[in-house]
């Protein structure tokens, strides 16, 4: 029974990963084609293509890691594969967090109806900063990755040189990561999460007040403008829930509370990667350009299926 449940969650994780890879790849391809055609991208499209690319690679790395580890646990636990995976995973995860934060800030400055002078100044200046913020996010993520590697590698090497058994090496690796890294990861990940949280809450509050004001002025719930604001609110709340779930999952995952030997490992991996698999679809359906191309592909697929 336990083996059947494990197989079920592995299959569910695989399907979720395929959906995430396909959706993020779709965003990158559509906006990449736009970039090649016109030679430039709007600030929103810059963030979306960066976020899609980082999520695509992160989902791919995470999927390969999970299945390689489950198949080659002995070699992976005692070899350099663990280092290789963590090096890429930390970089991509940090970049993804920052890109999500800048996306929320851009949404906030473009949509929120706030009249404070500082916000109005930021509303005017922020779009021009987007390319530099994205480049800075990549640089910060690279530095953070080197920091983790610098702290991590000597400790692993010391235990490997002592020729511990594979099981002993795995236990020491887990202990090192459990005792030294969660607090560091919490501090590093909390910075973009705080930026995201402030921006998204300001935007949700602004949209909520605007929707209430429209209803108070006689607009019905069926009014197109009211429906548009309601859809935007639902989209932002979904983004907030998924991002918060991803943040909490990664913090708990950093404590190694649920290891590969745990019965809940695969359900937990589903929770960890849920945001980067589901949120791309929210972005696709809420973006006119992406939704239009996606609808065309669905029509082509339907015509091919009927034919």
Curated annotation (Swiss-Prot):
The keyword Metal-binding does not apply. GO terms for cellular component: plasma membrane. It is a multi-pass membrane protein. Residues 1-7, 62-88, 151-183, 256-264 are extracellular. GO terms for molecular function: bitter taste receptor activity; G protein-coupled receptor activity. Receptor that may play a role in the perception of bitterness and is gustducin-linked. May play a role in sensing the chemical composition of the gastrointestinal content. The activity of this receptor may stimulate alpha gustducin, mediate PLC-beta-2 activation and lead to the gating of TRPM5. The chain crosses the membrane at residues 8-28, 41-61, 89-109, 130-150, 184-204, 235-255, 265-285. Residues 29-40, 110-129, 205-234, 286-307 are cytoplasmic. InterPro entries: TAS2R (IPR007960). Glycans are attached at residue 167. This is Taste receptor type 2 member 41. It comes from Pan paniscus. The keyword Transmembrane helix applies. It comes from the Eukaryota. Keywords: G-protein coupled receptor, Glycoprotein, Membrane, Receptor, Sensory transduction, Taste, Transducer, Transmembrane, Transmembrane helix. The gene is TAS2R41.
């Amino acid at each position: 029974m336990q083996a059947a449940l494990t197989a079920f969650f592995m299959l569910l994780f695989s399907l979720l990963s395929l959906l995430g890879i396909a959706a993020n790849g779709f965003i990158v391809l559509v906006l990449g084609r736009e970039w090649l055609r016109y030679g430039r991208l709007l600030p929103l499209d810059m963030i979306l293509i960066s976020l899609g690319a980082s999520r695509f690679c992160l989902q791919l790395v995470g999927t390969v890691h999970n299945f390689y580890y489950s198949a080659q646990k002995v070699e992976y636990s005692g070899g350099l594969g663990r280092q290789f995976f963590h090096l890429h995973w930390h970089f991509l995860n940090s970049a993804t967090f920052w890109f999500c934060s800048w996306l929320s800030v851009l949404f906030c400055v473009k949509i929120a109806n706030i009249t404070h002078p500082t916000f109005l100044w930021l509303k005017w200046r922020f779009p021009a900063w987007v390319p530099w913020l994205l480049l800075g996010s990549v640089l910060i993520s690279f530095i953070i990755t080197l920091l983790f590697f610098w702290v991590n590698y000597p400790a692993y090497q010391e235990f490997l040189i002592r020729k511990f058994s594979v099981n002993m090496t795995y236990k020491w690796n887990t202990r090192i990561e459990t005792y030294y890294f969660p607090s560091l990861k919490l501090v590093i990940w909390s910075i973009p999460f705080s930026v995201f949280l402030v921006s998204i809450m300001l935007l949700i509050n602004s949209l909520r007040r605007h929707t209430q004001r429209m209803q108070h002025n006689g607009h019905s719930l069926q009014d197109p403008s009211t429906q548009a604001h309601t859809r935007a609110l639902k989209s932002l709340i979904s983004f907030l829930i998924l991002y918060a779930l991803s943040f909490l999952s990664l913090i708990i995952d950093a404590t190694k509370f649920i290891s590969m030997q745990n019965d809940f490992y695969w359900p937990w991996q589903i929770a960890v990667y849920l945001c980067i698999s589901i949120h791309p679809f929210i972005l696709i359906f809420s973006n006119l350009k992406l939704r239009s191309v996606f609808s065309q592909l669905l029509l082509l697929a339907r015509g091919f299926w009927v034919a």
